[in-house]
Structure formats: C-alpha cells, structure tokens
C-alpha cells in the first residue's frame, strides 16, 4: 500500500522494527507530518476513519461492534483512531487474544480537531 512518490524516512525502519516485537504500534504527531504515509509502508489493509463517505458508518460500527473494524489483513492500519476512542480497548483485547506481533498500526493527530467555522456573514 505504498503511496506514489513516497520519500523514505527514518521512521520507516523504526515502525517496521516495532511491528516485529509489538502487537500494536501507535504513530502520533501533528496533522500533515506523514503519519499515514509512513504507516502505509507497513500496512496490509487500512480503515480511514475520516473518509467522508464512510466515517458515519465506521463510527457507528465502532460503537456497536468495534472488533469488526479490526478485521482484515495485518498489519491493519486504523487511521485517525482517536475519532473512535473505544477502538483502543478493542485493539488491546485483539492483541492479547491473537498473541502475535504486527497486528495493528494506529495513527492519530495530536492537533486538536477544528470544529465547524462560521464565516461571520449573516
């Protein structure tokens, strides 16, 4: 799942190594720093929680049956996982149950979410 024109980073090796010893790895940082692009280097499948066409469905599923979002080829990338914080416990449970390294990569922005902005007109 390598993006076109990806520029290799030191973090690629760090993430690859972490996935050999840990069931799940969290990658966090400010928006647009390359968390998702770096994580895609290792991911075999991905869920984009911010996908405008699927976000509402994903968030409802995270509430009803979070394990369903964890199904897929591993390592499974859960992008912007902080949108559904209940996934944290679901990932921990799945990692404990599976007992295998390299199951999940969780990316999340440390930049606060920006709410709806009003133009001030009207």
List the model feature ranges, each with a label.
Residues 1-122:
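Phosphate-binding site recognition
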